[in-house]
């Protein structure tokens, strides 16, 4: 139908036509192909993420200005990215979603300018920004301007870091330089089988190195969740990914000047019942008699958190340490915990970096950190030493020492050597340090200590094994316990395991008014 744009009615109709074109910028065939892969369109993702009727789109009518390679003949509205703002559970967020059905989601000048604009808006208004990545990369037809806009996006990612929460959803390809934007954000969520992220693809790798690798093995969700640690959650499908992001947002504040969201009903109940529950009482028998027998630290974490509700982060990467979010009396907290059922809970390179990054995230966004300790030390081996366990393990120490949020640490069993110091010790600035009677706080474990201290004695003994057992028992009785540390104030109290939740609650109540500042400086020089 012809529209007379010289009349008011015609102008209104013309706008409606343009907006309709913008909504259906991708061809029906492109949308069909997207759905056939189990992927939603950009708009479908945004609408599922945000509260109903809350999305306000920005730059819906923006179009590229390129004339190279016949581009002037195809100028769809929106230019392949949907941007705007809306709410999640009533809280404002800014979003952008790359649209693979338009130019393969490739980034050109206008595309990049739209993302930059919404990121600037997020920083000005102090609200989280969520990016949905599904892109073929830079728009080759627009040349170096595409690279320039990638750089502009990266700079804003860096400037927003620690100011507003940034979350990346990888819901398709994300390759080349584009990967560095999600890498800088606070959390990256990928979808099994449909998300792929890499610097160089399988074909280039085959050409340069001769290696044969599939796209899924190289940069799929499982690889980045288990091997590289680039991703924080592997979703079974796109709806699962979106649900995880909504859960994440529920624990995070709007920005670095805000408190984290809280459950008002729980917060107002200041006389909350602190009598031990059945779950609390079960902790008294959790730690095995043998120090070499493992147990699941999740049991401790879930007993302390409200309703046992724990949102784990990076569960598939470095499983020897647990990190994630929960609530205590309705208020968000971050949790770091050694996991004895994985590598005996030792700290290795991956675990150190995983926990360090998480502690710094909590510190940036005013979330108290609860630390549960059962660590026999750093993982020994040439592989660890040559790959930089000294430098990379120091990141965790650095993260705890620079944190100014409330820090509460509970030692459940082993806390040996340098790993004792690193795991939120009093010496690094933790506020309240508690220990169970099963805690063994010492320079090293009994077996290693006896081998060093009594080498001659054992060599001369008529029954070396019997003598060793005696000396090990003596060492554990006198040195591998929580009481020497308690005598010196390194732990504030030795508590019964069933008292843990109540003591953590009391500590966090006290620490709500904590104020601590670090020495003035531009920034620390964390050992990267």
Show the residue positions of the predicted features.
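Ligand-binding clefts of soluble mixed alpha/beta catalytic domains
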Residues: 1-528
């Amino acid at each position: 139908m012809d529209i007379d744009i010289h009349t008011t009615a015609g102008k209104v109709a013309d706008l409606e036509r343009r907006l309709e074109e913008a909504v259906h910028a991708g061809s029906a065939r492109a949308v069909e192909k997207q759905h056939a892969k189990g992927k939603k369109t950009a708009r479908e993702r945004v609408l599922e993420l945000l509260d109903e009727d809350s999305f306000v789109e920005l730059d819906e009518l923006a179009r590229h200005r390129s004339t190279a390679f016949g581009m002037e003949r195809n100028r769809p509205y929106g230019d392949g990215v949907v941007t705007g703002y809306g709410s999640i559970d009533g809280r404002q967020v800014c979003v952008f979603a790359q649209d693979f059905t338009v130019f393969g989601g490739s980034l050109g000048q206008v595309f990049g300018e739209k993302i930059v604009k919404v990121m600037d808006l997020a920083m000005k208004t102090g609200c989280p920004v969520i990016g949905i990545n599904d892109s073929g990369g830079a728009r080759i037809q627009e040349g170096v301007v595409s690279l320039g806009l990638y750089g502009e996006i990266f700079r804003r990612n860096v400037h927003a870091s620690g100011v507003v929460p940034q979350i990346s959803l990888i819901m398709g390809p994300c390759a080349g330089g584009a990967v560095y934007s999600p890498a800088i954000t606070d959390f990256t969520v990928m979808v099994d089988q449909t998300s792929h992220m890499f610097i160089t693809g399988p074909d280039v790798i085959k050409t340069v190195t001769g290696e044969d690798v599939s796209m899924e093995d190289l940069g799929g969700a499982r690889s980045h969740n288990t091997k590289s640690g680039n991703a924080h959650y592997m979703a079974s499908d796109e709806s699962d990914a979106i649900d995880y992001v909504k859960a994440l947002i529920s624990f995070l504040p709007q920005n670095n000047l805000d408190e984290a969201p809280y459950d008002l009903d729980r917060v107002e109940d200041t006389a909350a019942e602190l009598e031990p529950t059945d779950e609390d009482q079960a902790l008294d028998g959790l730690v095995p008699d043998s120090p070499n027998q493992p147990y699941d630290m999740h049991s401790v974490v879930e007993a302390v958190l409200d309703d046992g509700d724990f949102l784990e982060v990076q569960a598939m990467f470095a499983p020897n340490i647990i990190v994630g979010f929960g609530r205590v009396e309705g208020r968000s907290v971050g949790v770091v915990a050694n996991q004895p059922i994985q590598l005996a809970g030792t700290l290795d390179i991956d675990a150190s970096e995983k926990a360090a990054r998480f502690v710094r995230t909590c510190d940036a966004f005013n979330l108290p950190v609860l630390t549960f300790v059962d660590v026999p030390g750093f993982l020994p081996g040439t592989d660890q030493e040559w790959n930089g366990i000294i430098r990379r393990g120091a990141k965790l120490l650095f993260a705890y020492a620079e944190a100014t949020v409330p820090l509460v640490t509970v030692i459940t069993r082993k806390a040996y050597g340098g790993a004792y110091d690193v795991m939120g010790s009093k010496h690094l600035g933790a506020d309240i340090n508690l220990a169970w009677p099963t805690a063994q706080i010492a320079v090293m474990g009994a077996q290693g200590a006896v081998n060093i201290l009594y080498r001659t004695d054992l060599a001369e003994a008529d029954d070396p094994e019997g003598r060793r057992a005696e000396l090990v028992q003596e060492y554990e009785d006198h040195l591998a316990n929580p009481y020497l540390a308690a005598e010196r104030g390194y732990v504030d109290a030795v508590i019964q395991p069933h008292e843990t939740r109540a003591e953590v609650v009391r500590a966090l109540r006290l620490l709500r008014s904590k104020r601590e500042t670090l020495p003035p400086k531009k920034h620390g020089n964390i050992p990267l």
